[in-house]
């Protein structure tokens, strides 16, 4: 996915993280909040997220090359919400999550563009058991039609608000 972020000064992954974490979570659209709340509720009931707490270290943390780990703005293995950081550079970061439904890697990047910046994200999913394929098949239409577009417009909105407050 690619999100166009118009205007603004230099943009980094860590800067966007700060912007996102400093924003009221209720500013995300109702449909996205509802689907995320439903997922968390079902995760608690069916214990879908328990494996992440049982296994505190990331499976891929040890695979991060030493030079990349040294350049990372936070140590590999740093918890970040439901995810574990593999590495963070100024313009790219990679996170990992492991639970009862998936073992996934989230890649995010920011690049300059003619009108501002582009924010990219991609998720790579590896099945962890027989539930992964049907689970991903069930949620995929909701992710693609509601969650991702909702997050994209939300990110654009909070970015533009920040640019406007900064005067440019």
Where are these regions (language model features)?
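Short, highly charged C-terminal tails/helix-capping segments
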Residues: 155-168
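A short acidic/glycine-rich loop-to-helix N-cap element
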Residues: 125-146
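Short acidic, glycine/tyrosine-flanked loop/strand segments centered on an H-E-D-like triad
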Residues: 109-131
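Hydrophobic ligand-binding cavity/cleft-lining segments
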Residues: 1-72
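Hydrophobic-ligand binding "helix-grip"
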Residues: 70-113
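Intrinsic-disorder/low-complexity, polar/charged segments enriched in Ser/Thr/Lys/Arg/Asp/Glu/Gln
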Residues: 2, 92, 116-120
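Short, acidic Gly/Pro/Ser/Thr-rich loop/turn segments
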Residues: 10, 102, 128
């Amino acid at each position: 996915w690619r999100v166009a972020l118009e205007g603004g000064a230099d943009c980094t992954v860590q800067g966007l993280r700060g912007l996102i974490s400093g924003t009221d979570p209720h500013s995300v659209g109702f449909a996205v909040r509802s689907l995320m709340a439903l997922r968390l509720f079902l995760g608690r009931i069916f214990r879908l997220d328990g494996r992440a707490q049982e296994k505190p270290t990331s499976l891929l943390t040890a695979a991060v090359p030493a030079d990349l780990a040294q350049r990372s703005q936070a140590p590999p293995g740093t918890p970040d919400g439901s995810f574990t950081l593999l590495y963070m550079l100024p313009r790219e970061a990679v996170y990992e999550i492991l639970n009862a439904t998936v073992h996934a890697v989230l890649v995010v990047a920011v690049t300059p563009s003619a009108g501002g910046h582009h924010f990219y994200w991609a998720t790579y999913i590896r099945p962890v058991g027989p539930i992964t394929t049907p689970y991903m098949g069930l949620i995929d239409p909701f992710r693609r039609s509601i969650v991702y577009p909702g997050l994209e417009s939300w990110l654009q909105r909070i970015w533009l608000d920040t640019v406007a407050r900064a005067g440019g």
